[in-house]
Swiss-Prot record:
Keywords: Acetylation, Elongation factor, Phosphoprotein, Protein biosynthesis
Organism listed in the record: Artemia salina
Subunit structure: EF-1 is composed of 4 subunits: alpha, beta, delta, and gamma.
Family per similarity comment: Belongs to the EF-1-beta/EF-1-delta family.
Entry-annotated residues carrying N-acetylalanine: A2
One Gene Ontology term of the molecular function aspect: guanyl-nucleotide exchange factor activity
GO-annotated cellular components: cytosol; eukaryotic translation elongation factor 1 complex
Listed Acidic residues bias regions: 80-96
Sequence segments annotated as region (Disordered): 70-96
Full protein name: Elongation factor 1-beta
PTM notes: Phosphorylation affects the GDP/GTP exchange rate.
PTM-bearing positions, type Phosphoserine: S90
Length: 207
């Protein structure tokens, strides 16, 4: 069949490429050319040739009687012209198929690139303990909020009683995981050593 051996993997690969954007070998309905190729294959091709496998399953769904009723392969005006017919498409058709494939891939890539990237964020509650009950908690909160990092947003805060009149500062923040290291944030807060005794993570949740 047009010098293509469909029992060889190379021939099956060529036919698979041809069927990438069409349902039948010729035109918009099955023909005797489909039957001839089907018979030459003799068995279902590997699933690494998805278009060929789809076509094979479709042709195999027809009965022998139905296959005999398929129209014959179009004949040329002369034997010479017939010999020149490439039953599996011309180079121009291959180029057109490649062009369509390239356009589809470009459209997919453009669509994917325009899709906004998902920014992974976490909601964190920090418990910050002072040294004693004489620590100015309002000033300590002010110092904590003065810590600025790209991807860090401070939220609500409240004072929670501990013991002996001592209160801890419980403060919430939202961080972008790729930009903010919680360990680094804790270290920066701990630098206010005149106010801060310890910094602990009370809660950590993905947003």
């Amino acid at each position: 069949m047009a010098n293509i051996d469909l029992k060889a993997e190379k021939g099956q690969e060529q036919l698979n490429e041809l069927l990438a954007n069409k349902s039948y070998l010729q035109g918009y309905e099955p023909s005797q050319e489909d039957v001839a190729a089907f018979n030459q294959l003799n068995k279902a091709p590997s699933d690494k040739f998805p278009y060929l496998l789809r076509w094979y399953k479709h042709i195999s769904s027809f009965s022998d009687a139905e296959k005999k009723g398929f129209p014959g392969i179009p004949t040329s005006a002369s034997k010479e012209e017939d010999d020149d017919v490439d039953l599996f498409g011309s180079d121009e058709e291959d180029e057109e198929a490649e062009k369509i494939k390239a356009e589809r891939m470009k459209a997919y890539s453009d669509k994917k690139s325009k899709k906004p990237a998902i920014v992974a964020k976490s909601s964190v509650i920090l418990d910050i303990k002072p040294w004693d009950d004489e620590t100015d908690m309002a000033e300590m909160e002010k110092l904590v909020r003065s810590v600025q990092m790209d991807g860090l947003v401070w939220g609500a805060a409240k004072l929670i009683p501990l013991a002996y009149g001592i209160k801890k500062l419980s403060i919430m923040c939202v961080v972008e995981d790729d930009k903010v290291s919680i360990d680094e944030l804790q270290e920066k807060i701990s630098e206010f050593e005149d106010f801060v005794q310890s910094v602990d993570i009370a809660a950590f949740n993905k947003v």
